[in-house]
A protein has these predicted regions:
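Acidic/His- and Gly-rich active-site-bordering loop/insert found
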Residues: 1-93, 117-120
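Secondary-structure boundary/capping motif
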Residues: 20, 97, 134-135
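Active-site-proximal loop motif in hydrolases
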Residues: 92-100
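Acidic/histidine-rich catalytic neighborhood of metal-dependent amide-processing enzymes
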Residues: 101-149
Length: 149
């Protein structure tokens, strides 16, 4: 799946703050599994999930790529198109979450699916959380998990 297709799929999930992101997280889990990358889904509240994945060697250190999956509501906003359908106009992407922050998630997923994991000297950690837009609720719930790593 190329970046544009991946981003389009991520934008299509209506992961509005305080609603479930379960379908999106299972999509990401399935996407990573196709590259033989394991991940854990950590259930929070109201059907919302955090996702954690360690890619590469099982050792301390490495780099953490973290992003949130929720978007702010679209009610009361004037959109000229469906905000949950990616529009590409002259290589500019429009859709709810393109800037904050589903493009980052798409880039991260696209890149880790292409790297030669056996060449990594340190791990890459992925953490995708929920409800950042309303107080960083999801990341607060995953901090105790991170401390155990």
């Amino acid at each position: 799946m190329n970046f544009n297709t991946l981003l389009s799929k991520l934008i299509s999930f209506k992961t509005i703050s305080m609603t479930s992101n379960k379908e999106l997280m299972y999509f990401i889990k399935d996407y990573l599994s196709k590259s033989n990358i394991n991940c854990e889904l950590l259930e929070g509240s109201k059907g919302q999930f955090n996702l954690y994945s360690r890619i590469g060697p099982n050792q301390d250190g490495g780099i953490l790529l973290s992003g949130h999956t929720d978007v702010v509501p679209t009610e009361g906003q004037s959109w000229n198109s469906n905000p949950f359908k990616l529009i590409n106009k002259k290589n500019r992407f429009y859709g709810r979450g393109t800037c904050d922050m589903k493009s980052f998630i798409a880039v991260s997923l696209d890149l880790v699916s292409k790297i030669n994991i056996s060449n990594l000297k340190k791990p890459i950690h992925l953490i995708f959380s929920y409800d950042e837009e309303i107080g960083c609720v999801g990341i607060q719930k995953i901090v105790p998990f991170i401390k155990k790593l």
